[in-house]
Structure formats: structure tokens, C-alpha cells
């Protein structure tokens, strides 16, 4: 469960805290992050020593499901929500959410968004393109995995069943 102010890299030339610092001594094999979460994004991040699995989970053709909880600087209008679902044009092409909804009936500045794209900073760019500022971004689901039971900065080993599901592609 990646905390804020942690860089998703194996080695940072600026000597900032990295996700590798969180798992120091976890195993003898060389492990590395699967995909990226920017420094201020929190949540589910997978680390592995299996290059084939990492490739399968990050390659665009496999379209792995990611769900984020987004806290915005202001209420998201229904019209903007519908536009995100229908698709918006960004500098690097069109993107649409597979699902988007308010996480609370009252607070319209908290949103859940499901996407399959792995483009860099895609969730932030979606909302920024419509004039919103993302105040907090938390990935709550990635390729069948959640952060349930883990506090920020904590990690756990995957179960044998989870590893098998990931290897077989038995996840969204």
C-alpha cells in the first residue's frame, strides 16, 4: 500500500524515499515495481521478480483493470462525469472511463473511476483537462488485487492462489 511522497522506482538519483525502501530485506531476489504510481499517488502497487508477469500486467494490449478513489478540489458536475465516461480528448489521444461514480451521495468531490489505460498520469490528466485539481489519488484495485487490511506503507506477500491467478491472466 504505497504511501504518499514515495517514488515508484528501484533507484532514485535524487535520493528520495522509494518503494524499494518499504520492502528492504523482503527477499533475496531482485524485485522491481510493476507499473508506476506518481510520488503523490497512494495505493495498490505490485512488486515482483518475474519479468514476464510484469510485462503481462503492464502491456497495453492486456488492459488490466485499475480502480482509483479521487478527491477533487471542487464538486464534479454530472455533465463532466458523463463526458469522462463518454470519452475526452487528451494530447496523446482519446480516453474514457470504463466506470465513474460519486463515492458518496452527498460529497460530489469524491469520485471512483475505473480505467484500463496505463498511460502516464492518466487519471490526473483526465480531471485536469476539465479544470479540476486532484487533491488525493488512491489506487484501490489493480489486476484483481486490493490493499484491504494494509495500512499505508505496509506490504504483504501474495498468496499462491493470487500468484497463479496473475500468471494465468484470470483477472481483469
Q: Where are these predicted regions, by residue range?
A:
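Basic, flexible Lys/Arg- and Gly-enriched helix-loop patches that mediate nucleic-acid binding at interfaces
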Residues: 2-172
Amino acid at each position: 500500500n504505497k504511501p504518499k511522497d514515495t517514488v515508484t522506482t528501484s533507484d532514485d538519483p535524487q535520493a528520495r524515499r522509494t518503494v524499494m525502501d518499504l520492502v528492504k530485506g523482503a527477499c533475496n531476489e531482485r524485485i522491481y515495481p510493476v507499473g508506476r504510481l506518481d510520488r503523490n499517488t497512494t495505493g495498490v502497487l505490485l512488486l515482483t521478480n518475474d519479468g514476464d508477469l510484469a510485462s503481462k500486467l503492464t502491456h497495453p494490449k492486456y488492459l488490466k483493470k485499475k480502480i482509483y478513489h479521487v478527491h477533487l478540489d471542487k464538486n464534479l458536475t454530472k455533465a463532466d462525469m458523463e463526458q469522462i465516461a463518454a470519452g475526452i480528448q487528451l494530447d496523446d489521444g482519446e480516453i474514457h472511463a470504463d466506470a465513474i461514480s460519486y463515492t458518496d451521495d452527498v460529497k460530489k468531490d469524491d469520485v471512483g473511476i475505473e480505467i484500463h489505460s496505463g498511460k502516464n498520469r492518466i487519471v490526473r490528466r483526465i480531471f485536469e483537462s476539465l479544470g479540476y485539481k486532484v487533491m488525493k489519488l488512491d489506487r484501490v484495485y489493480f489486476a484483481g488485487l486490493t490493499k484491504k487490511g494494509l495500512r499505508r506503507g505496509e506490504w504483504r506477500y501474495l498468496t499462491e492462489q493470487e500468484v497463479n491467478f496473475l500468471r494465468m491472466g484470470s483477472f481483469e
